[in-house]
Amino acid sequence: MPLLSRRPAGTPRLLLLSAALTLALAAGCAGPGPQSAAPAAQAPETAAEKAAAAWPAEAAPAAVTCPEGPPPGARCLRGKDSAGAPYLIVVPARWSGNLLVHAHGGPFLGAPTDARANEDIKRWSVIVREGHAYAASVFRQGGFAVTTAAEDTERVRRIFVAHVDKPRRTFLHGQSWGGMVAARAAELYPRSWEGILFTSAVVAGPATYDFRVDIRAVYQHLCKNHPRADEPQYPLALGLPAGSTMTNAQLAARVNECLALNKPAAERTPEQRARAKLIADIIRVPENSILSHLNWGTFTLADVTRRHGGAPIGNTGVRYTGSPNDAALNADLDRAGLRFAADPAARARFVADVDHQGRFAVPVVTTHGIHDSTVFVEGSDTLRQRMVAAGNGQGLVQTFVESSEHSYLGEAIYPPLLQALITWVDTGRKPTPVTIAEQCRSLQAAGGGAAADCRFLPDYAVKTLASRIPAR
């Protein structure tokens, strides 16, 4: 029997206001989008959906005290699914009937814990404050495993339907790396979702990560300490050699030895400043993000290569630019043996696990900070290209924000996106970047907030991913 036999009557005042504003704004939008989410529910059953029908029945979640984040009166439920993934469900006191299934960022290389779920609901409590139910898996497998994470995402949706209530509408939300998970879940289980929201998301497939091999090669050329000359040498595209015990702290120590990123620029030596600037210029990232990208290109890349039996990313034939003498730079990389070929079989396995083809037959709304140095905004163009190629281009609305943030773009940004997506699904009227920006300002005015917090850029024209990460 569902834990909520019926949903409470009424909706939050702000939710009613924002819905009304959305309807008004949508009435003037150009061109209808997908008329409803019903066609997705009627789509032919996929192989993954057929396989999911044989999954074991899931135990009911347990009612628990809510972690920090959800508003007063919200109900929180926890459990561990049949595959071993912890999850958290939150239902507001006055539920709209909409469910957002959240796919979190990362990935994290350790075992899944409730702490990860607590961190995400604290950040994404805006979903519940807007009146919507929230369900999120922590994913059974630590590390870069996308298909299994997509399965866990579908599984927590099924748990909600079986043990909490049947939603009026079900939406899929992918944040950061969770965008890759959500894209995979959307194609594996298309009949489960009526709309998709991507925020700061990885939506360009494996090419998103190519530059993490680039930064390893350029860093090693300049610093020569990862690995050191007296340590076993290995192809840097592996991340780390088998059996390595290197820690994050040890890597940071080496990076600071060469670049002194732990010091203000004024306290670095001229050589350290020059090396840091050169890496930033070639890789096209800010200096303060170099260490995080090297972490990924070391520890996460090692996880990826271990899972797929070889290096799925290489840099053979890549011509690097941004240095004072690009010809000399590329020749030096060639002579130093800092070119690495991707293993075709490992590449194929990696692509099969993580990639998407834009086959989303439901409304899709995205947002991204244009100065995001973790997941580059240019990946948004790849999403557009793929959805157009799949015949779904009319089902996409992309927004961009004046921000360098990645994990959370601000309290003002997400309510208008949620309402635009929900109203699109409900009415079939497609929003635009302009109407979403207008709605943001209206919601801010109604709630006593500052219109300046609505940093949407309706006229922003995103460039191709190849303009930021060299193609290979």
PLM segments and residue spans:
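Bacterial signal peptide processing site
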Residues: 30-33
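Accessory cap/linker subdomain of secreted extracellular hydrolases
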Residues: 43-68, 202-355
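Histidine-bearing beta->alpha loop at or near hydrolase active sites
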Residues: 396-409
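Short beta-strand/loop motif that positions the catalytic acidic residue
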Residues: 366-368
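Primarily recognizes the serine-hydrolase "nucleophile elbow" in alpha/beta-hydrolase
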Residues: 169-224
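Gly/Ser-rich "nucleophile elbow"/oxyanion-hole loop immediately N-terminal to the catalytic nucleophile
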Residues: 94-95, 156-176, 192
